[in-house]
Amino acid sequence: MDMDLNNRLTEDETLEQAYDIFLELAADNLDPADVLLFNLQFEERGGAELFDPAEDWQEHVDFDLNPDFFAEVVIGLTDSEDGEISDVFARILLCREKDHKLCHIIWRE
């Protein structure tokens, strides 16, 4: 893949894109009770956090996950307002290069 550092999604755009994908696909991939829980609790405890891709993504994809071009977004619920996401509903791997639309999701089981 030929990618351009000057043609990347910003961190905010990456988070927004991941959240939009999550909302579109959650009902088909999560237990209905989890979808209900997420929808009821998101306003108070919901969050999306951006990370460099975790090493375990290499078990799911067969290409180099250069953190300049790939990001992992974790979507879920926190235990406190300032806390980290403790109740993960999805981990989303996105390519941040705008011309390479690529997304992989590990859903809560």
Swiss-Prot record:
Fetch the InterPro entries from UniProt.
Answer: dsDNA_mimic_put (IPR007376), Put_dsDNA_mimic_sf (IPR036763)
The superkingdom of the source organism is Bacteria
The protein's matches in Pfam families, at most eight in alphabetical order, are given as: DUF440 (PF04269)
Family recorded in the similarity comment? Belongs to the putative dsDNA mimic protein family.
| Protein's job | May act as a double-stranded DNA (dsDNA) mimic. Probably regulates the activity of a dsDNA-binding protein.
Entry protein name: Putative double-stranded DNA mimic protein YciU
Record lineage: Bacteria, Pseudomonadati, Pseudomonadota, Gammaproteobacteria, Enterobacterales
Gene encoding the protein: yciU
